[in-house]
Amino acid sequence: MMAVAEASQESLKQRLNVSGGNGLKGTLRVSGAKNSALVLMTASLLSEETIELTNIPSLTDIDGMSAILESLGVQVDRQSDCIRLTAAELSGSAPPYELVNSLRASFFSIGPLLGRLGHAQVPLPGGCRIGARPVVEHIRGLKALGAVVNVEHGIVTASVPGSKKRLTGAQIVLDCPSVGATETILMAAVLADGVSTIENAAQEPEVQDLANLLNSMGGQVSGAGGPLITVQGVERLRGCSNYPVIPDRIEAGTFLMAAAITRSPLVVEPVIPEHLSAVIQKLRDCGCSIQIKGRAVTITPGEITAVDITTQPFPGFPTDLQAPFMALMCTAKGTSVISEKIYENRLQHVAELQRMGASIRLEGSTAIVEGVAQLSAAPVTGTDLRAAAAMVLAGLSAKGITEVAGLKHLDRGYDDLEAKLSAAGAEVKRNIP
């Protein structure tokens, strides 16, 4: 627990010095998906047997989730990109606030704890400060499955009434296709009595990855990846070995945009192309040639021209790539309109890009971006995870050396970003005071 806090404090003091004007070359390797790995780790709470996950990225968020699971009695064994989780005997159902506060994904523990133990007490989550990300849908779904849920003083307490301590299958219709709510309900329903359906379910690849893991553990989940998911509850789930986390589509998209903003031909792999269809289409629209061969994506940028994007749930353009794409559009020919429809406070990077000479006008949750000939280096701060990535990308194309602060955010979601970029020809150096 202390080690996680110390790592976060250390990264607060660090800066990333990014020298602009260097092209990229070769291949950038994509790590396992952060947003999938965190949820799959919490699924270990559903079984008494060992869950072995591979292709786990090296991130502070993974360290934080490991600490949360250990606080609940899970044995965690991490070796390189493999993690073994054994929840044979859980010692508690209430993860501590000091761990949960910095990691939004910690709230995913409520579904497995409730499904297996019949009770859970989880503080409301933390993570990036990019606007309201309520858990109303999560709670409504748990109540539909028969849980009694109370929220008081920032803590969500949930329990299953009766002697069986077992949830009951139900028909659940989400008001919006929330990824977190879909995954929470899915993990709670897998051990419930009877059949559950989730209508208007999130269709993101990370939901599919969770369903695939649960099925490999003996669950009966069908329809994941579509708007209707059906879950036939089972008595128990077994362990599983060597389950690979899907490649991180957001990291892959960031790398493709790094190639585009530096006007560099590059290979990005491994990528599941259908996970990035909307992004690949927009990159093609703005002047990039993209070739796909298996899980390798080769991008060859031409003249970059402005295109418009609107963030949407999958399979639309992902909100997590809005900031990096805006950095690219700052260097494009023409005017682009970027509309953020998922989170109301996810345009904080605009002010930082303006410090680098970007021409951006805000109208509510929409940014109008006039491309400029070249950005100029400046000291900037990544105000959240994806904003930090956008600052790095802007620095790669800017004149001079850009100093990027806010690395605690970057380290939450990008596995050794500076080393990967440096290996591809960028001049990126972490300044440790």
Curated annotation (Swiss-Prot):
Entry annotated with the keyword Ion transport: no
Binding site residues for phosphoenolpyruvate: K34, N35
Gene Ontology CC terms, in alphabetical order: cytoplasm
InterPro entries referenced in this protein's UniProt entry, alphabetically: Enolpyruvate_Tfrase_dom, Enolpyruvate_Tfrase_sf, MurA_subfamily, RNA3'P_cycl/enolpyr_Trfase_a/b, UDP_GlcNAc_COvinyl_MurA
Keywords: Cell cycle, Cell division, Cell shape, Cell wall biogenesis/degradation, Cytoplasm, Peptidoglycan synthesis, Pyruvate, Transferase
Pathway: Cell wall biogenesis; peptidoglycan biosynthesis
Superkingdom of the source species: Bacteria
EC number(s) per entry: 2.5.1.7
UniProt-listed CDD domains: UdpNAET (cd01555)
Subcellular location, principal: cytoplasm
Residue numbers of 2-(S-cysteinyl)pyruvic acid O-phosphothioketal PTMs: C128
NCBIfam families, A to Z: murA, PRK09369.1
Function: Cell wall formation. Adds enolpyruvyl to UDP-N-acetylglucosamine.
HAMAP family the record matches: MurA
PANTHER family: UDP-N-ACETYLGLUCOSAMINE 1-CARBOXYVINYLTRANSFERASE (PTHR43783:SF1)
Family indicated by similarity: Belongs to the EPSP synthase family. MurA subfamily.
Name used for this protein in its record: UDP-N-acetylglucosamine 1-carboxyvinyltransferase
Annotated organism of origin: Synechococcus sp. (strain CC9605)
